[in-house]
Amino acid sequence: MAVICLVRPYDGQAQTSMVREHQPIKRMVTERKLKQQIDILCDSIHAGRAAGEKGGGLTARWIQSEFERLGLLKFGSSYGHGVLLGNGRFGRNIIGMLPGSKHFSREKYIIVGAHYDHLGILEGKMYPGADANASGTVALLNIAEMLSAFRNTGRDHDYNVIFVAFDAKESNMAGSKRLWRMIQNGELVNPQSGARITKDKIAMMVNMDQLGCTISPLKSGRKDYIIMLGNDSLKPIKRDMLRICNRTYAIDMEIDYTYYGSKNFTQMFYRLSDQRIFVDNGIPSILFTSGITMNTNKTYDSPETIDTEILRKRIFLIYHWLDRML
């Protein structure tokens, strides 16, 4: 109870009010909508979303149209930012910003990302990548939509949120490395203030990679679980926030802060996705995942393997956690 009070002291009436104010916003995220978005990303027109290929480019265009629909601010003239892949090929990170409160410092940022690329077509076979990582991509889009809608009700957050759909994770994480170089080189500029976004202004990076499956459960065997890695990189006062949100908003998922209880696998898996470059540069970084499964990087990682009911719950939990962290 002491931790809860330190983080944000709410009495029962205030908690009830807080839960209610999110309900209209959460109704925007339906299982049907999640399925439709995953189907789009896994459609044959996107050809497995390989970085630098036509299918990857079409996927980038679709994500840009979603960012436009949500009203996210562009960095420069476009949401798309090139990623050099070699051999004359280019990928594209899609980057947009949701502004923070006018009443607080405008130069504080949290980066929220998910990679949208996958393996493409290999030896004539398409790899749809439904869990890896259409699931994380639709989580990114729906969290951006909910936070944007919440802002439109008059509720601002202290931090600016930079949403990034990374390309080229499957190409040695070239997309996230490119974003970091933009930050290092002063290329990432606040679209409102014109100030350069530097390392010292980034409070946290949050990555979502493989959130859609339930076939690799934790010890209890429950389907409704989520794995959060990097929690110990946060300030101690914030480390219980996911559990607080899980309880406060009656989401009631099983939470693990390790990769299936193994210290070695936790350390290894924590470095296998786009948060790695931020970890290496001292930025507190979080990975949300449901874990690698026997479908990962297989042709049968397809939309019908996604549990949209559980994916929706995971999205809600991450959304509420972000709302409290912002």
Would you name each region that the model predicts?
Residues 96, 112, 117-173, 318:
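Alpha-helical metal-binding/catalytic segments enriched in His/Glu/Asp
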Residues 1-17:
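Bacterial Sec-dependent N-terminal signal peptides
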Residues 65, 289-326:
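His/Asp/Glu-rich mid-to-C-terminal helical/loop segments that flank catalytic regions of hydrolases
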Residues 166-273, 285:
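Metal-dependent peptidase/peptidase-like ectodomains
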Residues 41, 67, 84-123:
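Acidic/His- and Gly-rich active-site-bordering loop/insert found
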Residues 12-58, 63-65, 69-73:
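N-terminal hydrophobic or amphipathic helices/low-complexity stretches enriched
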Residues 20-28, 44-54, 81-85, 124-133, ...:
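Second-shell loop/turn segments in exported
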